[in-house]
UniProtKB/Swiss-Prot annotation:
Catalytic activity: N-acetyl-L-glutamate 5-semialdehyde + phosphate + NADP(+) = N-acetyl-L-glutamyl 5-phosphate + NADPH + H(+)
Cystine bridges: none
Record localization: Cytoplasm
Coiled-coil region list: none
Source organism: Streptomyces clavuligerus
SMART domains cross-referenced by the UniProt entry: Semialdhyde_dh
Annotated protein name in UniProt: N-acetyl-gamma-glutamyl-phosphate reductase
Length: 341
């Protein structure tokens, strides 16, 4: 199978990561690498040698995005929605922005400040029922990077009724904020410092995390407190998730649930007891590392997960969903081992 692919927003970190992975995908060929502000400029990703001589084309739903089997939309919120509506049913989209993830219009408008454009099938294959929904899907909403790490850490316990009231602290590298120049991401500001941001439930990924947890509780609302931290590293997320155990739950039960849930998952590794996830171990891969522990003194479950925010957290997750939608083996073209040290 040969699949014609276009990448809208290929000049950014997420779009560039899609291109990197496509270069190693046996079924892919593409014509269009597009951008907004960098249209007409040479591809600015030095590590992508095979396309270094290419020039970014302007983004348009008519051309050059038209006529492709798959289009990856690696664009900021609201821009993807407008482009998808303009293209209509002719384009098969994998949206890597936030536009179509949330099911509640009011929640979307409160966190993003723009009109809600609906929701698409959610591209997290490991979540219950997702693979069936993604098979043959023409449009897929790729999860956010934080929700990917947190959902895969917590949904086995939440779905099994072992916990409630989630508390999440997650550390992310600077690439999660995009490639645009921002003063707080300058080397002098970031190096040697870890700082919180979007504290007090204001981060845009908070409702997505809650939505994913609620999806495995038969609609019973789940309370989530999420605090993100910016770390002086270019990529990676380490999420430390804590939740109150339901009475009578012990460490053995928790471990058994996670072992059963992830026994056959190609991209989720439940580590041996006593071994803890690290961002370096998953760097450049589509892999998720997970470890669980019970704090008996506090009656709390602690789950730690690590992902590469640009691979499994964005571009790799998008290709994984694309493989399922096209009927390809799910692991096609996706690295399963990290680069550490």
């Amino acid at each position: 199978m040969t699949v014609r692919v276009a990448v809208a927003g290929a000049s950014g970190y997420a779009g560039g990561e899609v291109v990197r992975l496509l270069l190693g995908h046996p079924a892919e060929s593409w014509v269009a690498l597009t951008a907004f502000s960098q249209a007409g400029q040479a591809v600015g990703h030095p590590h992508l040698g095979p396309v270094a001589g290419r020039v970014f084309e302007p983004i348009s739903a008519q051309a050059p995005l038209a006529g492709h089997d798959v289009v990856f939309l690696a664009l900021p919120p609201a821009q993807s929605a407008a482009l998808a509506e303009e293209a209509g049913a002719r384009v098969v989209d994998r949206n890597m922005g936030a536009d179509f993830r949330l099911r509640d219009a009011g929640v979307w408008e409160r966190f993003y400040g723009s009109p809600w454009r609906g929701c698409w099938p959610y591209g997290l294959p490991e979540s219950p029922g997702a693979r069936e929904a993604l098979a043959g899907a023409r449009r897929i909403a790729v999860p956010g990077c934080y929700p990917t790490a947190v959902t895969l850490a917590l949904f086995p316990a939440v779905g099994a009724g072992l916990v409630d009231r989630e508390v999440v602290t997650a550390v992310s590298g600077t690439s999660g904020a995009g490639r645009a120049l921002k003063p707080h991401l300058l080397g002098a500001e970031v190096m040697g410092s870890v700082s919180p941001y979007a504290v007090g439930g204001t981060h845009r990924h908070t409702p997505e995390i809650a939505q994913n947890s609620t999806a495995v509780t038969d609609g019973e609302p789940v309370s989530v407190s999420f605090t993100p931290l910016l770390a002086p590293m270019p990529r990676g997320i380490l999420a430390t998730c804590s939740a109150r155990l339901t009475p009578g739950t012990d460490a053995r039960q928790v471990r058994a649930v996670y072992e059963k849930t992830y026994a056959d998952e190609p991209f989720v590794s439940l580590l041996p007891e006593g071994v803890w996830p690290s961002t370096g171990a998953v760097l450049g891969s589509n892999q998720v590392q997970v470890q669980v522990a019970v704090d008996p003194a506090a009656d709390r479950l602690v789950v730690v997960s690590a992902i590469d925010n640009l691979t499994k957290g964005t571009a790799g997750g998008a290709l994984q969903s694309m493989n399922l939608a096209l009927g390809l083996p799910e692991t096609t073209g996706l690295p399963r081992t990290g680069l550490a040290p």
